[in-house]
Structures are given as structure tokens and as C-alpha cells.
């Protein structure tokens, strides 16, 4: 009898703890609100009220001429990547975009843009197949951080996908197109799980084949295309735009250097995206 009562008591305690735990969980819902932006929202998060929660950095939303500088619940505004104390009740977070005062054209020193494709390195879900998408990173120009996007095109062929992966890799199928910022002398670097041999950059494959490749751009075009030739798992894309003086004695620069890096998820779970 005592043993049965003890078991009942323990079961009741477990039930009460479970109820209390579930009652303390809250949902943070991401919404555009009245904002019109290109891209996709971060995934909603279910967390325990009062616990630490880190807001995502912006890798998936873009407004031309502006930068995502915060997430607001209507009362408080938090910076992307900031760790906060989760509220006690569920809340909706909408993005705050601030107009840029600088652009890549204003850079007076080499700028590096790094795009990571995998969740491990901060990317949000990438699921681009039979459609177009974007990936966003930040560049620092004269002390100001600005959003810079690349375009992912798989409308007719190709695929970009890191869904359900927790590593640094994203699957890319042949014929997917990535449009990136560029200038004469820009250096493009990519990393993949397997050797890159057929992928072209601005129509050329002038690199030493390998898991990490690097190619310098000869044209003065402001954007160039990368066409995936080697279906594989990719981790990052890095673009470095050099500074090119427009006048020998002047202080104005056009098409100055900048770098961009794209990263992808772990290959250890490669079967997840087959």
C-alpha cells in the first residue's frame, strides 16, 4: 500500500513538473508586419520564458538601400545576434530596417563579404529549388555595417538546400546560378566538400581544382555569375573587392575591393538533402 502511494506521489510530481515546464514555454514569432522585404523570415522559436535567447543575425531578408538593424516586439528593440532574456509571454518580432548612408561604391579600402551556407555558421533555412532566393551578409564601409545580398537562381535547374542540417554545409546541384557583387580584380573563393572542377565564375574556370578554389575577376562588371558545375555540398563563398582609384591624384575610388564569403552545412549529414 505504501509503495503504491509512493509511486502515485512520484507520478503526480512528474506530472506537475511537466505541466509547469510546458506552461513556461513561450513562442517568438517572426513577422514582416507592414514591411515589404525580399527573402524569408527566420524560423519561429519556442523557448522557456526567462531563459537566454540569441536573436538571429540577418542572412535572409533584404530591403534595397537599407540594413536590418533590429527586431522589435513593439516595446523593446533588440539587435540582430543579441542575447536577450526571453519574455514571460509569447511575442511577435518584426524587423527594423534603417536607411544606409553608405554603399559598396563608397568603400575606400578592400571590403570582404563572407556568405555562409550552413546553419552551424548562422545561416537560416535555404530551400531554393524551381524558384529564386537570396542570401544576405554584412559589409563594413567607412565604419557602417550594411546588408549586401547575393541572388540564388534555381528557377529552371539547380538546387540550394540546407534544410534539416545542423552542420556547415548546403547542397548545391549543377546549373544553379549565384549572382554576386564584383569589380575588376575581385577575388572569389569557394569551399566545397568535394573537389570543384567544373564550376564557372564569370564564365571561366581559371582556378586550381580542389576543395577550396580562388579566382580573380578580369572584367569590370558590377555583378558576375557563378554557375555550379560540380553538384556537391558547399560551406562558404568569399568575395574580396579591391580598391581601384579613379584618379591618380584624387581621393575618390570606384569599384573598390570588397570580399564576400558563402558558407554551407556539414557533409556528415549529406544524406539529409539527397
Located regions from the model:
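A short beta-strand element within beta-rich, extracytoplasmic domains
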Residues: 182-196
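Extracellular Ig-like/FN3 beta-sandwich strand-entry sites
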Residues: 88-90, 185, 221-223
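Short, surface-exposed beta-strand/strand-loop-strand elements in extracellular ectodomains
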Residues: 194-207
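N-terminal targeting leaders for non-cytosolic proteins
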Residues: 102-172, 252-274
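Short beta-strands within extracellular/lumenal beta-sheet-rich domains
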Residues: 160-185, 210-214, 233-236
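Sec-dependent, cleavable N-terminal signal peptides
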Residues: 1-25
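Short beta-strand-plus-loop segments that form exposed binding edges in beta-rich domains
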Residues: 226-233
Amino acid at each position: 500500500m505504501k509503495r503504491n502511494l509512493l509511486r502515485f506521489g512520484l507520478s503526480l510530481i512528474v506530472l506537475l513538473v511537466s505541466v509547469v515546464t510546458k506552461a513556461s514555454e513561450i513562442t517568438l514569432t517572426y513577422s514582416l508586419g507592414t514591411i515589404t522585404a525580399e527573402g524569408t523570415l527566420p524560423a519561429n522559436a519556442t523557448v522557456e520564458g526567462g531563459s537566454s535567447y540569441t536573436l538571429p543575425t540577418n542572412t535572409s531578408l533584404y530591403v534595397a538601400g537599407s540594413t536590418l538593424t533590429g527586431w522589435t516586439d513593439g516595446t523593446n528593440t533588440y539587435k540582430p545576434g543579441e542575447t536577450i532574456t526571453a519574455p514571460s509571454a509569447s511575442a511577435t518580432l518584426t524587423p527594423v530596417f534603417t536607411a544606409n548612408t553608405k554603399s559598396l561604391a563608397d568603400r575606400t579600402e578592400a571590403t570582404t563579404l563572407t556568405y555562409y551556407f550552413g546553419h552551424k555558421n548562422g545561416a537560416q533555412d535555404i530551400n531554393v529549388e524551381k524558384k529564386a532566393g537570396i542570401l544576405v551578409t554584412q559589409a563594413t564601409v567607412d565604419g557602417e555595417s550594411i546588408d549586401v545580398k547575393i541572388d540564388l537562381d534555381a528557377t529552371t535547374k539547380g538546387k540550394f538546400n540546407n534544410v534539416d542540417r545542423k552542420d556547415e554545409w548546403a547542397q548545391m546541384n549543377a546549373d544553379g546560378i549565384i549572382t554576386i557583387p564584383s569589380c575588376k580584380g575581385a577575388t572569389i573563393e569557394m569551399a566545397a566538400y568535394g573537389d570543384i572542377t567544373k564550376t564557372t565564375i564569370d564564365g571561366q574556370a581559371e582556378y586550381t581544382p580542389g576543395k577550396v578554389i580562388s579566382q580573380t575577376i578580369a572584367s569590370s562588371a558590377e555583378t558576375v555569375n557563378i554557375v555550379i558545375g560540380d553538384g556537391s555540398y558547399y560551406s562558404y563563398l568569399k568575395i574580396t573587392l579591391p580598391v581601384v582609384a579613379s584618379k591618380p591624384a584624387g581621393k575618390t575610388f570606384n569599384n573598390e575591393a570588397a570580399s564576400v564569403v558563402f558558407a554551407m552545412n556539414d557533409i556528415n549529414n549529406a544524406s539529409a538533402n539527397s
